[in-house]
Design a protein with these regions (language model features):
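Flexible coil/turn and secondary-structure edge motifs
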Residues: 2-202
């Protein structure tokens, strides 16, 4: 069951995982790639957060070039369903993005989220540099204290992110009355919005 309890860690002092400009301020944007089950679900969550500039659903972590949704669903490509998150680290640090990640899906179930089963639904963080890798490992350790079972989230370098087909983008926003959206995504998003109300976009 997805953990959506406990006190969010907003405001806790941590080192921000950002590059620095010549004047010492963080760069304008960063990107991190995350997989936590069906990308429709996790995309809907991150779309709501302050500081998130864009969320793209796609595929990564496997060996097949330019995979299709059908190929990824077959479980033969090695890819996971993921989202590529572009964010402003001056508004939301990577640490907070990663803490949300470990709260909005179950990182203790191997290759599964609820009824969605297969390696394409695995929990995964794909980093772009050493600072992101270190942040991911630290977030995983923080999250483990809140879960009774071992966290199985894979942490690996990003090779290539492939955008999913257009109809997958903003799927929940565009299809709120579709069956899966009503039964699975809507309750998840409602719980998330209640817990993180102070950090939602206006």
């Amino acid at each position: 069951m997805t953990l959506l309890s406990g006190t969010p860690r907003w405001g806790r002092e941590r080192g921000r995982v950002t590059q620095q400009t010549t004047n010492g301020s963080p760069t304008a944007t960063e990107r991190i790639t995350l997989g936590g089950g069906c990308f429709w679900c996790i995309e809907a969550v991150y779309d709501d957060l302050q500081g998130i500039l864009s969320v793209e659903s796609g595929y990564a972590g496997g060996q097949t070039a330019n995979p299709t949704y059908k190929q990824v669903c077959s479980g033969t490509t090695g890819h996971a369903e993921v989202i590529d998150v572009t964010f402003d680290p001056r508004q939301i640090p990577l640490d907070d993005i990663l803490d949300v990640f470990f709260h909005v899906h179950d990182p203790t179930t191997l290759n599964r989220q609820g009824a969605d089963v297969g390696t394409q639904y695995r929990s995964i963080i794909l980093y772009r540099n050493e600072a992101q890798r270190a942040a991911a490992e630290a977030a995983k350790q923080r999250a483990q204290a809140e879960w009774a079972n071992p966290i199985v989230t894979e942490i690996a370098p990003l090779d290539t992110f492939y955008n999913a087909e257009d109809y997958h983008q903003e799927y929940f926003a565009n299809n709120p009355y579709q069956g899966y959206c009503q039964v699975v995504i809507a309750p998840k998003v409602a719980k998330f919005r209640k817990q993180y109300a102070q950090r939602l976009k206006a």
